[in-house]
Amino acid sequence: MIMRMTLTLFVLVVMTAASASGDALTEAKRIPYCGQTGAECYSWCIKQDLSKDWCCDFVKDIRMNPPADKCP
């Protein structure tokens, strides 16, 4: 539960910074777990025990492409 709250807060901070700079992709690549692909971000997100839908939305929010076989 604490991990989810921490991750949510972290994502909000990153997305706020990304909105301010106008470049979410650049900001997302500064997050160590995102790597270079949407699949890497999705994989990391799932390992945090977050829902499939939440992870799909997260990857899309940072302007990366989630894995097509996992996200509709």
Swiss-Prot record:
It comes from Conus imperialis (Imperial cone). This is Conotoxin im23a. It is found in: Secreted. Disulfide bonds join 34-41, 45-55, 56-71. Belongs to the conotoxin K superfamily. Keywords: Cleavage on pair of basic residues, Disulfide bond, Neurotoxin, Secreted, Signal, Toxin. The cysteine framework is XXIII (C-C-C-CC-C). The keyword NAD does not apply.
